[in-house]
């Protein structure tokens, strides 16, 4: 068998998934900041959804906004963790990253926080 390999120019566009770990951090920093932040081009995932859910539980206002890249999500976040006295339940789903990142943040709320999850 003879095989002939001929060089050919290569081209195209490749959309590489964003780092989920950096996405968590971006959302958390925006939630901690006073005022409005726009976090763009985060790869959609259940873990990111869990982080948004818990940050909302802590008082951040998070709105999904249209993204220009397919498979990505952008968020408009009105930051500021709200202190209170009412106990809250933070559902981390199956996201270990959400749990690890947000346990310390729960202390800032001044509330009793119960963390829940599913899966492994």
Predicted regions and their residues:
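Short, structured segments at the rim of ligand-binding sites
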Residues: 1-120
